[in-house]
Curated annotation (Swiss-Prot):
It comes from Mus musculus (Mouse). It catalyses: L-seryl-[protein] + ATP = O-phospho-L-seryl-[protein] + ADP + H(+); L-threonyl-[protein] + ATP = O-phospho-L-threonyl-[protein] + ADP + H(+). This is Proto-oncogene serine/threonine-protein kinase mos. It comes from the Eukaryota. GO terms for cellular component: cytoplasm. InterPro entries: Kinase-like_dom_sf, Prot_kinase_dom, Protein_kinase_ATP_BS, Ser/Thr_kinase_AS, Ser/Thr_Kinases-Pseudokinases. The gene is Mos. Its EC number is 2.7.11.1.
Length: 343
């Protein structure tokens, strides 16, 4: 039997002035042979929260962990159920090498807390208060976006019990379909003044309905926050192989940084190759100083007009100057036209 997660119900007051400041009620937990059972009572406020504030309150008696999906530097992600519905639960650990970075990652995940879009993994609920014996800095309950990432599909390693072949999954039509899903998600995020800043195949989930959903917002930033910090340099996380030159140089991020990352991702979908080899610091230097990019010389790009079109789209996305890259809206239009021309 899965075990309920023993955390409290509310985010702190500073997240929203509309939530009252009563102290958290941490339920008692008694061990049983089959797991843990909550003995504490539900705070009276929880059932009465309006829909627009529903994600501030979690009924932890309805949360049951099933198994771990993965782990990283900041914590672990589990498959679970919440009120009987499959969800993913991310726990951010306290004892990481960089506590402040893990705190930033947790709060960055909540940049999308109130957003709803078919191509964005939805935040269901979150909590920062934990029992004294817990190692968790915070917990986020998210929509379960799927068992498989785009990275796994590209490189042939999936968790699916009956994995489909990579070549079958990544025909040109499939690449364009997935690309449009991702660009639709980016267009929505940018319309909400949110930058993802770590877009890559490993952070794109593929649902059972074959829909791509952008996930892992631990590096995300709000545009207004970036503008406020313009006078002082600040750290932006992410994956160096997918980071735009201006990010590697420490400049202020814009939506065009996500477009650059999408260009690398589209190249991966098309070639099924790894973007770079070599030491990270040398790759970063070459990207900035020598305009290094993954190769577009393969037959997949040069042997047909279709390949040439893909080549042009990718090149436009990873232009050295951010202003020369298309925005998500123009990119969406070009991909739709390309897909339509293929019939």
């Amino acid at each position: 039997m899965p075990s309920p997660l023993s955390l409290c119900r509310y985010l702190p007051r500073e997240l929203s002035p509309s939530v009252d400041s009563r102290s958290c009620s941490i339920p008692l937990v008694a061990p049983r042979k089959a797991g843990k059972l909550f003995l504490g009572t539900t705070p009276p406020r929880a059932p009465g929260l309006p829909r627009r504030l529903a994600w501030f309150s979690i009924d932890w008696e309805q949360v049951c962990l099933m198994h771990r999906l993965g782990s990283g530097g900041f914590g672990s992600v589990y498959k679970a159920t919440y009120h009987g519905v499959p969800v993913a639960i991310k726990q951010v650990n306290k004892c990481t090498k960089d506590l402040r970075a893990s705190q930033r990652s947790f709060w960055a995940e909540l940049n999308i807390a109130r957003l709803r879009h078919d191509n964005i993994v939805r935040v269901v609920a979150a909590s920062t208060r934990t029992p004294e014996d817990s190692n968790s800095l915070g917990t986020i309950i998210m929509e379960f976006g799927g068992n498989v990432t785009l990275h796994q599909v590209i490189y042939g390693a999936t968790r699916s019990p009956e994995p489909l072949s990579c070549r079958e999954q990544l025909s040109l039509g499939k690449c364009l379909k997935y690309s449009l899903d991702v660009v639709n998600g980016l267009l929505f995020l940018h319309s909400q003044s949110i930058l993802h800043l770590d877009l890559k195949p490993a952070n794109i989930l593929i649902s059972e309905q074959d829909v791509c959903k952008i996930s892992d917002f631990g590096c995300s930033q709000k545009l207004q926050d970036l503008r406020c910090r313009q006078a002082s340099p600040h750290h932006i996380g992410g994956t160096y192989t997918h980071q735009a030159p201006e990010i590697l140089k420490g400049e202020i991020a814009t939506p065009k940084a996500d477009i650059y990352s999408f260009g690398i991702t589209l190249w991966q979908m098309t070639t099924r190759e790894v973007p770079y080899s070599g030491e990270p610091q040398y790759v970063q230097y070459a990207v900035v100083a020598y305009n290094l990019r993954p190769s577009l010389a393969g037959a997949v790009f040069t042997a047909s007009l279709t390949g040439k079109t893909l080549q042009n789209i990718i090149q436009s996305c990873w232009e050295a100057r951010a202003l020369q890259r298309p925005g998500a809206e123009l990119l969406q239009r070009d991909l739709k036209a390309f897909r339509g021309a293929l019939g």
